[in-house]
């Protein structure tokens, strides 16, 4: 553990205003201390390490040059903004990162005025920043707006929509492309470096601006010809450097690439271009995990490594060999098995192949596995195209990210009754990633769609069997399987496949007084709670629906006829999910049991451990037991 004296400059910075008082030589030391502080805190309190080590100098330079919070910094995704949080009045609370009641792991305007726009999902920064920049222009403000987007996020469709619109409106937006994967070709040679110095210089841009105004004043060019002039100058630059890029084709002035870890160069370039008129993009090259050897060498492993020894780089294992398998690994291994059985099966995922374990199929059958990048809507429509031609796509998307592809599901898949499987990983409350990542809306927003099958397994065996069921001839149309992140319930799950009848649930336990109706893995908590209340003499039946749609009406008739009290338990929002379906059925069929709903309340849930959030929402075992006792 480092002492306060080890952070002689960083711990004196309580806001960017303090940072801006320092000499540039001192700012280099701030970068060193900031990187060390991030490593120290994250070694004990896990979070996103690699991306934050890579943006230290960029973050410091932005706050050193721009007048935040008056000037706006809009982060894309936002998991790389820890340094930003530390410099913006949250250093002392940084140890509470991602903890219940602590600061978020992503920018959140409700947390700080320095967080200009919410982040968590990818590719929204350019559109948001453009709107803010135009608002600033309309109000006659001199506010600078900066969007920070990575080379992964910029592949998203929303980013391209924003880029396409940037030059259509008057604005001085600055886009910083944080390239940490060398996804875009590098400029080479001395001419390119000289051109960067020239095109960012005050003299060049003053002459450029005055020349344009002169031509316009004397009607030599008209406003509508401005784009032609800009394209001409961009073409000239491309001719000189033997390079051209999409940004200049969209009439966005392009600068770079520059070293994203050279703080002096970053500060100089930001100072030179911040007052330039018109939209511009600065291409900054960074190294993910910069300054921490293990993270630089294995960027994928150290993206979010958990606890580790900051001195040795050894990751600290917190799991036991005796734990069940991860649901993600069950999905991955089962998909490989099914693909061996059926040559038409393919895998599709939007940039989450490792997280969802589709890498298993990718390793064995790379020609039948498609990682389409950060493009959820494209992933669904691409899978629909595969299905249209007779393939059987398993499209795996995190539940919260599937929200971005809602229209694609309806228009491109369901309306055509295409046979495809949507696997919603990270369903339910996900824990420390918080409000932008909880997958609690899926049951509700999918249930209202006609001609769709929606399922949720109780355990790993069910997940395996539902994947098998989804490829059977009687499983027509879009087949949804939702399951949570993390460990399952069973140590042995690799049984022979068994198709689960579509639209049929099951009665897990007999009971006389109360009927518990559940769907998904939260049913395991319900089983434990029921065993506890049985010891108190309360007789509780338990029904696992398996299918939300089509729902098992035979089971619901049985429940309506035989129980005066029904407790519905689900790990999704209580508005529109299983509970709503049960209430609708009972009303429509003339049953009048008392119905109690346990699930995610009608509000956005913060970050914290899953256990803490279940307790917060009244979904933990203790809360379920209390409810059953009260309803006796």
Curated annotation (Swiss-Prot):
Pathway annotation: Metabolic intermediate biosynthesis; 1-deoxy-D-xylulose 5-phosphate biosynthesis; 1-deoxy-D-xylulose 5-phosphate from D-glyceraldehyde 3-phosphate and pyruvate: step 1/1
Membrane-crossing segments per the record: none
CC terms in the record's Gene Ontology section: cytosol
Cofactor(s) the record lists: Mg(2+); thiamine diphosphate
Reactions accelerated catalytically: D-glyceraldehyde 3-phosphate + pyruvate + H(+) = 1-deoxy-D-xylulose 5-phosphate + CO2
Family according to the record: Belongs to the transketolase family. DXPS subfamily.
Oligomeric and partner information: Homodimer.
Full protein name: 1-deoxy-D-xylulose-5-phosphate synthase
Organism: Azobacteroides pseudotrichonymphae genomovar. CFP2
The organism's taxonomic lineage, starting at the top: Bacteria, Pseudomonadati, Bacteroidota, Bacteroidia, Bacteroidales
